[in-house]
């Protein structure tokens, strides 16, 4: 039997090993110069003014919501078809997640769905740039500006994604992820970009115990060794070990995403003759980062259910993913919002399947997946 082909695998090489070795030998392994370099690199990538590296995108979402003073009595609009961490952070702060439906074929939250969900209690909107494609962020941001509501872009899938010629996060506030399956990774990590100087200042405090400066600031700039707590905060800083890996990966981003795109194109060409439905691409000008390649497996159309397909692929040594089970169908949120109905979200959540897609995949790997899909179509 062939070696198991995972759904995802990080592309690590000698450059990442050398970057870690350099940090370990430097004597400064926690938040330090590599963090600063990573933040500067993301400002350059996105064109935004401020970047704040954090221990995860979830941590970034937590402190961004906190900095916006979102809490009990507030509502935050976001799709249900997203990773549950966003809903969890909203709920843990005492606010109410208002989950809205997505477009049936792009799986993007729409401006119309967002605007129809706004109430006097709405405090923030969190659109998701899904699977590596961009949401219609100009239209969504215009709604936020019209109603005076903050927009926080969930850009966890969007390192290397462009919308109308601009990298995601070029303006406003966006949160990126460096988790192990993302387009660039440092195992765990995240980063917030923003053009709001006051928000950036608050985020830096909240990510490091509520202190006005961190240890590297104090050493570098000679500030008082007894840093003062300005507000209660968290331990969400990123180590320089992680930052060094992320920097090395960022330097490879174009190469990594180009290979993802080539594998995605190979899938697209083959699927044209198969009943499995890939996602539609957004109509607006964009560059897709191809974080995920998702098909919809409708049993009536394909002759096999999604779950049966995933199991059959596993038996053939091929891994798959599910991105995502709709959050409002999870036990906690199902019991909290028992009457919530999101038809497009639910239809897709029962049928979506993420195929293997990662930079070290070969065309032969993709052919193996395609051959298996051809064999299973109609079963």
Swiss-Prot record:
Catalysed conversion reaction: UDP-4-amino-4-deoxy-beta-L-arabinose + 2-oxoglutarate = UDP-beta-L-threo-pentopyranos-4-ulose + L-glutamate
EC assignment: 2.6.1.87
Sorted UniProt keywords: Aminotransferase, Antibiotic resistance, Lipid A biosynthesis, Lipid biosynthesis, Lipid metabolism, Lipopolysaccharide biosynthesis, Pyridoxal phosphate, Transferase
Gene3D superfamilies: Aspartate Aminotransferase, domain 1, Type I PLP-dependent aspartate aminotransferase-like (Major domain)
GO biological process: lipid A biosynthetic process; lipopolysaccharide biosynthetic process; response to antibiotic
Pfam families reported for this sequence: DegT_DnrJ_EryC1
GO molecular function, one term: UDP-4-amino-4-deoxy-L-arabinose aminotransferase
Cofactor field: pyridoxal 5'-phosphate
Record pathway: Nucleotide-sugar biosynthesis; UDP-4-deoxy-4-formamido-beta-L-arabinose biosynthesis; UDP-4-deoxy-4-formamido-beta-L-arabinose from UDP-alpha-D-glucuronate: step 2/3; Bacterial outer membrane biogenesis; lipopolysaccharide biosynthesis
Superkingdom classification of source: Bacteria
Modified residues (N6-(pyridoxal phosphate)lysine): 182
Transmembrane spans: none
Function in brief: Catalyzes the conversion of UDP-4-keto-arabinose (UDP-Ara4O) to UDP-4-amino-4-deoxy-L-arabinose (UDP-L-Ara4N). The modified arabinose is attached to lipid A and is required for resistance to polymyxin and cationic antimicrobial peptides.
Assembly description: Homodimer.
Protein known as: UDP-4-amino-4-deoxy-L-arabinose--oxoglutarate aminotransferase
Origin species: Shigella sonnei (strain Ss046)
Gene name of this polypeptide: arnB
């Amino acid at each position: 039997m062939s070696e198991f082909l995972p759904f995802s695998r990080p592309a690590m090489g000698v450059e990442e090993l050398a970057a870690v070795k350099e940090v370990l030998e430097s004597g400064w392994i926690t938040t330090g110069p590599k963090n600063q370099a990573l933040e500067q690199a993301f400002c350059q990538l996105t064109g935004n003014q401020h970047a704040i590296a954090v221990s995860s995108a979830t941590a970034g979402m937590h402190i961004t919501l906190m900095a916006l003073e979102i809490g009990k009595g507030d509502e935050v609009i976001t799709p249900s078809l997203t990773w549950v961490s966003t809903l969890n952070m909203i709920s843990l702060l005492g606010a109410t997640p208002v989950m809205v439906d997505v477009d049936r074929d792009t799986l993007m939250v729409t401006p119309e769905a967002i605007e129809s969900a706004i109430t006097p209690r709405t405090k923030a909107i969190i659109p998701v740039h899904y699977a590596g494609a961009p949401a219609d962020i100009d239209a969504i941001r215009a709604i936020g500006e019209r109603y005076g509501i903050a927009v926080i872009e969930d850009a966890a899938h969007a390192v290397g994604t462009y919308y109308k010629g601009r990298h995601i996060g070029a303006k406003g506030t966006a949160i990126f992820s460096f988790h192990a399956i993302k387009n660039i990774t440092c195992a765990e990590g995240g980063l917030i970009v923003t053009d709001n100087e006051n928000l950036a200042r608050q985020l830096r405090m909240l990510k490091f115990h509520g202190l006005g400066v961190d240890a590297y600031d104090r050493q570098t700039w000679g500030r008082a060794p007894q840093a003062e707590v300005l507000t209660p905060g968290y331990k969400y800083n990123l180590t320089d070990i992680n930052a060094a890996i992320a920097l090395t990966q960022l330097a490879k981003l174009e190469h990594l995403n180009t290979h993802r795109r080539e594998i995605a194109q190979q899938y697209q060409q083959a699927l044209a003759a198969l009943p499995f439905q890939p996602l539609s691409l957004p109509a607006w000008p964009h560059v897709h980062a191809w974080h995920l390649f998702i098909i919809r497996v409708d049993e009536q159309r394909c002759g096999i259910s999604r779950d049966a397909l995933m199991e059959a692929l596993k038996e053939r040594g091929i891994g798959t993913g599910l991105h995502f089970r709709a959050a409002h169908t999870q036990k906690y949120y199902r019991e909290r919002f028992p009457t919530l109905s999101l038809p497009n979200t639910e239809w897709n959540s029962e049928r979506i399947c993420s195929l293997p897609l990662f930079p070290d995949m070969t065309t032969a790997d993709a052919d193996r997946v395609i051959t298996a899909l051809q064999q299973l179509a109609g079963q």
